[in-house]
Design a protein with these regions (language model features):
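Glycine-rich FAD pyrophosphate-binding loop
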Residues: 27-49
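Dinucleotide-binding Rossmann-like beta1-alpha1 core, especially the glycine-rich loop
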Residues: 52-98
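N-terminal Rossmann-like FAD-binding beta1-loop-alpha1 element of flavoenzymes
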Residues: 5-35
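A structure-centric signal for secondary-structure junctions around beta-strands
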Residues: 7, 30, 48, 90-91
């Protein structure tokens, strides 16, 4: 088993949303990739315990890196839903201005 790690081009540590997204993107290239996860299943840590909200970017300062990446990330989820046939329920949200 250890020999496999020695010959890998990339080792991704963590099998939650970020690690698996990185691994998926790397799979598009001619690379030997390995995913290492301490839990018995994927997405068993932070990803499993999150609030399942995809932030639209409205709460970050206009033009900030956070706003730009929130909008881009939200768009990517819509693209991934179509590409992978994900069962995502888009419920929307309500924001109260104070």
């Amino acid at each position: 088993m250890m020999e496999f790690f020695k010959t890998a081009d990339v080792v991704v540590i963590g099998g939650c949303i970020v690690g698996t997204a990185i691994l998926r993107e790397l799979s598009k290239y001619d690379l030997k990739c390995v995913l290492v996860e301490k839990e018995p299943d994927l997405a068993a840590g932070t990803t499993k315990a999150n609030s399942a909200i995809l932030h639209a970017g409205f709460d970050a300062p206009t033009g900030s890196l956070k706003a730009v990446t929130n909008v881009r990330g939200n768009k990517l989820y819509h693209e991934l839903q179509k590409e992978l046939g994900l069962d995502i329920e888009w419920t929307g949200s309500l924001v109260a201005a104070t």
